[in-house]
A protein has these predicted regions:
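Acidic/His- and Gly-rich active-site-bordering loop/insert found
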Residues: 7-9, 13-114
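Zn-dependent metallopeptidase/amidohydrolase metal-coordination segment
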Residues: 19-22, 341, 348-363, 368, ...
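A short beta-alpha structural unit
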Residues: 27-31, 260-262, 271-272, 305-316, ...
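Active-site metal-coordination/substrate-binding segment of hydrolases
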Residues: 75-157, 162-173, 195, 208-211, ...
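Fold-level recognition of mixed alpha/beta catalytic cores in primary-metabolism enzymes, strongest
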Residues: 144-235, 247
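His/Asp/Glu-rich mid-to-C-terminal helical/loop segments that flank catalytic regions of hydrolases
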Residues: 168, 232-249, 278-279, 324-330, ...
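Acidic-enriched catalytic cores of C-N bond-cleaving enzymes acting on peptides and small amides
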Residues: 205-209, 228-258, 275-350, 389
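Active-site-adjacent substrate-binding region
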Residues: 234-237, 241-257, 406-449
Length: 488
């Protein structure tokens, strides 16, 4: 089958759906492989879209693109508006799917009220934002102020595009981000964050005693932003408590301690290799601590298990290094540190000890620090630096990105809420998330921005079961276009 015939076949899948232009552009970009890190082709498609229409545009070396449409008649003096989303998608597929997502487009399908891709992720996160932005830019009938479409790359793997983009071509101070997956919810704040690694130097020595392996397992874990408020245990922190109790019962040396794979995930298990003077006392401590943990977390994390078994002898951390490692685990803050004063139930500030490792000469603890208030994030980083310095260690900070603080005064939020209420006969839900969004990075570059994030209903993003709801897309498009119309 020729490439032209394949494209024709793809185009026929969504051809009857409304809004026609939105689904046309969604189908166009769905024919282009656009996983994170593989965005050159789709970026070039967007640049060609702009070139053919004579639209001002900027494409950078990262493949980010800005496309600008001038104001329509009567809107020349209106404030410009930014429409923003990301072009990359998460590429996941069913176990029996043979598609090469690096080279092949998606096989779209419609069933009832949903669009999906056969065997793979759909990429409505965030292809629907790209499609809506293009539909606005392409329209000859839609009234609007100057529209500045900002379409970034690699949001799904660290927001690298938003970090690197130059926003100097933009005149707009209002930004509509179309990267939310729940219709009727306006996100108006998000957390900033940083990765903080605390490293304690460690000398080793021979220590007489019995080698034991201790494991804390069975925890639920979860995302350290979205699920930090669920009252679940952190396996690394529990291991710190256990080791401190062990030191009260018998002399011991730590050989290694490890737990967790990602600093933005609450660790479900933690493991320590130790050499103890009194094995029976150590086993009694493990049994006692298991009972304590089960009781404390019986509602939110009730399957915690502490096991102990014979280990292999190896050179251990010396007494000072063992004590400092345990002290770090006991004294470092973890979990929720502050709740929002503006939005009920929202976590404002938190941190998570997500990765714990031991090298030959060091013990390392990696934290994910989050806050929607920049000074609170800095305060937590300062605490980690101070505690680590007192223990003779060093701290490295990476991936520092700004948050998006809630604005009491938001003309964009007020306008969109007014339009929403008229269309839906009820007010939107005003929400915030304790995780990062590109809006936070843009605010770091342009603090004057007034942002709202919204989107149509998308189910099971980042899985091959992802589905975009058609009717929800229609309503979201109507909300967007009416908002633009009222910006005169």
């Amino acid at each position: 089958m020729s490439a032209a015939r394949r494209k024709e076949k793809r185009m026929s899948v969504l051809n009857g759906l409304e809004p026609k232009s939105v689904f046309k552009f969604f189908e166009d970009i769905s024919a282009i492989p656009r996983g994170s890190g593989n965005t050159k082709a789709v970026s070039d498609y967007l640049a060609e879209f702009a070139r053919v229409r004579g639209l001002e545009h900027y494409q950078d070396e990262l493949n980010n693109i800005i496309i600008i449409a001038p104001a329509t008649e009567g809107y020349e003096n209106a404030e410009p508006v930014i429409i923003q989303g990301h072009m990359d998608m998460v590429c996941e597929k069913a176990p029996d799917c043979a598609k090469d997502m690096e080279k092949e487009g998606l096989d779209l399908a419609v069933e009832g009220d949903v669009v999906f891709a056969r065997g793979t992720t759909l990429g409505a996160d965030d292809g629907i934002a790209v499609a809506m932005a293009l539909a606005v830019l392409d329209s000859k009938e839609l009234p609007h102020p100057r529209v500045e479409a900002v379409i970034t790359v690699d949001e799904e793997v660290g927001m690298d595009g938003a970090m690197g983009i130059d926003l100097s071509p933009l005149k707009g101070k209002m930004l509509i981000n179309i990267d939310s997956e729940d219709e009727g919810i306006f996100t108006v704040s998000c957390a900033g964050g940083a990765h903080v690694e605390c490293t304690l130097p460690a000398a080793r020595e021979d220590f007489d005693g019995q080698a034991l392996d201790i494991a804390v397992t069975g925890l639920l874990g979860g995302h350290s932003g979205a699920e930090i408020d669920k009252g679940r245990a952190n396996a690394n922190m529990l291991m710190g408590r256990l080791l401190y109790a062990l030191g009260k019962a018998t002399e011991f040396r730590l050989v290694s301690v490890r737990g967790g794979l990602k600093d933005n995930a609450i660790p479900t298990a933690s493991y320590a290799a130790v050499i103890v003077s009194d094995a029976d006392a150590a086993k009694a401590v493990c049994a006692e601590m298991e009972a304590q943990f089960k009781d404390e977390y019986r509602v939110n994390d009730g399957a915690i298990c502490v096991s102990v078994s014979a280990g292999e002898r190896a050179p251990a951390l010396d007494k000072a290094a063992t004590e400092k490692a345990v002290c770090m685990l006991v004294c470092m803050p973890n979990g929720i540190q502050a709740m929002s004063a503006d939005i009920a139930g929202l976590v404002q500030t938190s941190l998570n000890l997500g990765i714990l490792t031991t090298r030959e000469d060091a013990v390392c603890a990696s934290f994910s620090v989050r806050s929607s208030v920049a000074s609170q994030k800095r305060m937590l980083i300062d605490r980690l630096e101070c505690l680590t310095a007192q223990l003779g260690g060093t701290v490295s900070i990476s991936g520092d990105y700004p948050g998006w603080a809630y604005r009491q005064d938001s003309p964009l939020r007020d306008l969109m809420a007014e339009v929403f209420t008229e269309q839906y006969s009820h007010a939107p839900t005003i929400a915030a998330i304790h995780a990062g969004l590109e809006c936070g990075l843009f605010l770091g570059k342009k603090p004057e921005l007034d942002c709202v994030s919204l989107g149509p209903d998308i189910d099971e993003i980042h899985t091959f079961r992802e589905k975009l709801h058609i009717a929800s897309t229609q309503r979201t498009w109507a909300l967007l276009t009416e908002t633009l119309k009222r910006m005169k």
